[in-house]
């Protein structure tokens, strides 16, 4: 991943001037979604590229060490080898970008990946995921413990009430403490945009998170009623672009929640390419949080190679 974002001083004068043009954002989202994202002959290559952006995730109450092992195996071998050979991509080292688990499962993931002989990063959700409604002291300790157990990326959740009540300085201070607790681990800040009320709040929260030292800003926990949407993403991507123009710091973007199909993944790649350019299309600056997306990508690649759709037994690890 890229170098840490060390953050900037809080600039409330900038925050106070922000006002998002909601109808214009919706029009832009409709324009992008109406286009064909990738020509058919290029789809397999783009789908393989999408695989390398996935934070392969399991965040279930019934997670065990055995299904964490399966997750890590799939992260290392995301696409069946014979399919990769058919595309002449079997020797390119294609893996997912990371695995993402609960803090209590970090040790399991680190152990499984070490046994598999690969250096895929382990990301952990933390800071009272998914609601962010536990005591700050507890949230900070959760981050520290996840890092201590071997997580090199931490996906924290913000306290949404600070956004809804306009407590921007308190939000900045909270994320600064998260940044410090992460140490050398990279910080991804989940805004839970479906619970922020307005697109203006989404932009302001994005900017505060970047000022406070977030290496990535992330749309959602995946547990909200409304998760990653194009209008929200456009606002966040414009905030990333504005922050880059102002500071020279490139901040990553991670949509998560409801991204399940190969077609969805291509649409998200196209959106990031349109709004930020090709330089953001690398795992250091773009991730997709997903648990079932990889299965559909592998099915589509199977169809591209064989001309038929896979039966369940054809892709048993999906």
From Swiss-Prot:
Matches recorded under Gene3D superfamilies: Aldolase class I
GO biological process: carbohydrate catabolic process; deoxyribonucleoside catabolic process; deoxyribonucleotide catabolic process; deoxyribose phosphate catabolic process; pentose-phosphate shunt
Keywords for the protein's UniProt record, in alphabetical order: Cytoplasm, Lyase, Nucleus, Schiff base
PANTHER family in the record: DEOXYRIBOSE-PHOSPHATE ALDOLASE (PTHR10889:SF3)
Top-level EC class: lyase
Annotated localization: Cytoplasm; Cytoplasmic granule; Nucleus
UniProt note on tissues of expression: Mainly expressed in liver, lung and colon.
Catalyzed reactions: 2-deoxy-D-ribose 5-phosphate = D-glyceraldehyde 3-phosphate + acetaldehyde
Catalytic residues (UniProt): 155 (proton donor/acceptor), 218 (schiff-base intermediate with acetaldehyde), 254 (proton donor/acceptor)
Function: Catalyzes a reversible aldol reaction between acetaldehyde and D-glyceraldehyde 3-phosphate to generate 2-deoxy-D-ribose 5-phosphate. Participates in stress granule (SG) assembly. May allow ATP production from extracellular deoxyinosine in conditions of energy deprivation.
NCBIfam families, sorted: deoC
Complex and partners: Interacts with YBX1.
A GO cellular-component term linked to this record: cytosol
UniProt name for this protein: Deoxyribose-phosphate aldolase
Pathway: Carbohydrate degradation; 2-deoxy-D-ribose 1-phosphate degradation; D-glyceraldehyde 3-phosphate and acetaldehyde from 2-deoxy-alpha-D-ribose 1-phosphate: step 2/2
E.C. code: 4.1.2.4
InterPro entries assigned to the protein according to its UniProt record, in alphabetical order: Aldolase_TIM, DeoC, DeoC/FbaB/LacD_aldolase
Molecular function GO labels: deoxyribose-phosphate aldolase activity
Family: Belongs to the DeoC/FbaB aldolase family. DeoC type 2 subfamily.
């Amino acid at each position: 991943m890229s170098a840490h974002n060390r953050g900037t001083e809080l600039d409330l004068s900038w925050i106070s001037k922000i006002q998002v043009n909601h109808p214009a954002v919706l029009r832009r989202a409709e324009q992008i979604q109406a286009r064909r994202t990738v020509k058919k002959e290029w789809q397999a290559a783009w789908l393989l590229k999408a695989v390398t952006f996935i934070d392969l995730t399991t965040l279930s109450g019934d997670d065990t060490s055995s299904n964490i092992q399966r997750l890590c195996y799939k992260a290392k071998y995301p696409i069946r080898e014979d399919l990769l050979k058919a595309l002449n991509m079997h020797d390119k080292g294609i893996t997912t970008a990371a695995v993402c688990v609960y803090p209590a499962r970090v040790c399991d993931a680190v152990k499984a990946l070490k046994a598999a002989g690969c250096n895929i990063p382990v990301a952990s959700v933390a800071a009272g995921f998914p609601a962010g409604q536990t005591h700050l002291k507890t949230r900070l300790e959760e981050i520290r413990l996840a890092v201590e157990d071997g997580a090199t990326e931490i996906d924290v959740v913000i306290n949404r009430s600070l956004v809804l009540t306009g407590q921007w300085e308190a939000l900045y201070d909270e994320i600064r403490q998260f940044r410090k607790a992460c140490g050398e681990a990279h910080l991804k800040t989940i805004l839970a945009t479906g619970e922020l009320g307005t697109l203006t709040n989404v932009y302001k929260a994005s900017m505060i998170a970047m000022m406070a030292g977030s290496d990535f800003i992330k749309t959602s926990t995946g547990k909200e009623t409304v998760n990653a949407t194009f209008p929200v993403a456009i606002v966040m991507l414009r905030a990333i672009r504005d922050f880059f123009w102002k500071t020279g710091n490139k901040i990553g973007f991670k949509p998560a929640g409801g991204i399940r199909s190969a077609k969805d993944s291509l649409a998200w790649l196209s959106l990031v390419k349109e709004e930020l350019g090709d330089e953001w299309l690398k795992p250091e600056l773009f991730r997709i949080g997903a648990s079932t997306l990889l299965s559909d990508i592998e099915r589509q690649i199977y169809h591209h190679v064989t001309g038929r759709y896979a039966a369940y037994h054809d892709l048993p690890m999906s």
